[in-house]
């Protein structure tokens, strides 16, 4: 059994006086402008990738050791970091597979990887260039050595791809 709340006539008339000037709401839904937000994020990501591509020049070739495994260490970074990369002390949190890509596509993907690592605070990444015709294997170390956010890199240990991959140590600007 439910009780009905009955209001006396005075309460009803007071309520009607209180809402006398009120109008019905035409629309009470909220429209989110998510397409604009997504579009801005995509534009920002494209711009960051293009800016990162600026660091990769095909004309400039830094002096890298041609003997033994490919390795590089920026002047302000301890060589102990390269040793830790070689031994596999750093575990890559992000992997990039460049098999089957052209040089331009690989350059763009490499720039995007470095930006993604910086945004997500990832310190070590693995770039797999494969064996193939050795074009990417020769170009990737030259591009990485030019980027200011790359602290060091070394040929990956067997666990992470051996001579078909490179472990990259990326600087985190906090």
Curated annotation (Swiss-Prot):
Classification via SUPFAM superfamilies: SMR domain-like
Biological role stated in the UniProt entry: Acts as a ribosome collision sensor. Detects stalled/collided disomes (pairs of ribosomes where the leading ribosome is stalled and a second ribosome has collided with it) and endonucleolytically cleaves mRNA at the 5' boundary of the stalled ribosome. Stalled/collided disomes form a new interface (primarily via the 30S subunits) that binds SmrB. Cleaved mRNA becomes available for tmRNA ligation, leading to ribosomal subunit dissociation and rescue of stalled ribosomes.
Biological processes, Gene Ontology terms: rescue of stalled ribosome
Molecular function GO terms recorded: RNA endonuclease activity; rRNA binding
Keywords: Endonuclease, Hydrolase, Nuclease, RNA-binding, rRNA-binding
Annotated protein name in UniProt: Ribosome rescue factor SmrB
InterPro entries with a match to the protein in the record: Smr_dom, Smr_dom_sf, SmrB-like
The enzyme's E.C. designation: 3.1.-.-
Pfam families noted in UniProt: Smr
Signal sequence segment: none
NCBIfam families with a match to the protein in the record: PRK04946.1 (NF003432)
Keyword set includes Hydrolase: yes
UniProt cross-references to SMART domains, sorted A to Z: SMR
Record carries keyword Ribonucleoprotein: no
Top-rank lineage group of the source organism: Bacteria
């Amino acid at each position: 059994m439910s009780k009905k709340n009955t209001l006396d006539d005075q309460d009803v008339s007071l309520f009607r006086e209180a809402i006398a000037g009120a109008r019905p709401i035409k629309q009470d839904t909220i429209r989110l402008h998510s397409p604009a937000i997504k579009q801005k994020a995509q534009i920002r990501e494209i711009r960051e990738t293009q800016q990162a591509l600026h660091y990769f020049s095909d004309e400039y070739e830094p002096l890298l050791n041609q003997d033994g495994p490919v390795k590089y260490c920026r002047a302000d970074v301890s060589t102990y970091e390269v040793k830790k990369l070689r031994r596999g002390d750093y575990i890559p949190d992000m992997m990039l597979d460049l098999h089957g890509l052209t040089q331009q596509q690989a350059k763009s993907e490499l720039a995007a990887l470095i930006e993604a690592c910086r945004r997500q605070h990832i310190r070590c990444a693995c770039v797999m260039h494969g064996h193939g015709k050795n074009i990417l294997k020769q170009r990737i170390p030259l591009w990485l050595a030019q980027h200011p956010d790359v602290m060091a890199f070394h040929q990956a240990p067997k666990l992470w791809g051996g001579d078909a991959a490179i472990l990259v140590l990326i600087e985190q600007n906090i």
